[in-house]
Amino acid sequence: MESEEMLAGGLTEPRPATPEIQEIANKVKPQLEEKTNKTYEKFEAIIYRSQVVAGTNYYIKVHVGGNNYVHIRVFQSLPHQEDPLKLIGYQVDKTKDDELTGF
């Protein structure tokens, strides 16, 4: 399966969030709060999937307290472009058991 994970355009299997993924989520948290007009006291990345495009899309399931989760899609440009991380999309009102899919 390793070789399949490197195919451009394909989503990886869900993986446990790493400190790097938490850092990515933290960096786009203000963008999400602005778009949803909410403040998230808790913002813990749980799992993620990635997709290699002209950069990388990260799909991250974030626990925001209680039984509430959000799914966020973050785009990270190629390293030489030095663009900031960008929140591309989000899905609110998710649960722990909702599948993290491409959106």
From Swiss-Prot:
Where in or outside the cell it occurs: the entry states:
Cytoplasm
User: According to the UniProt entry, where does the motif Secondary area of contact sit in this chain?
Assistant: 51-55
Q: Which domain of life does the protein's organism represent?
A: Eukaryota
- Give site residues, Reactive site: 9
User: Which SMART domains has this protein been placed in?
Assistant: CY
Gene3D superfamilies linked: 3.10.450.10
Which InterPro entries has this protein been placed in? Answer: Cystatin_dom, Cystatin_sf, Prot_inh_cystat_CS, Prot_inh_stefin
CDD domains in alphabetical order: CY
> Which positions carry Blocked amino end (Met)?
1
Q: Name one GO cellular component term.
A: cytosol
Q: Where is this region: Disordered?
A: 1-20
What molecular function terms (GO) are annotated for this protein?
A: cysteine-type endopeptidase inhibitor activity
Keyword annotations for this protein, in alphabetical order, are: Cytoplasm, Protease inhibitor, Thiol protease inhibitor
Q: Which family does it belong to?
A: Belongs to the cystatin family.
Functional summary from the UniProt entry = Potent inhibitor of cathepsins L and S, and papain.
Q: Which protein, by its recorded name, is this?
A: Leukocyte cysteine proteinase inhibitor 1
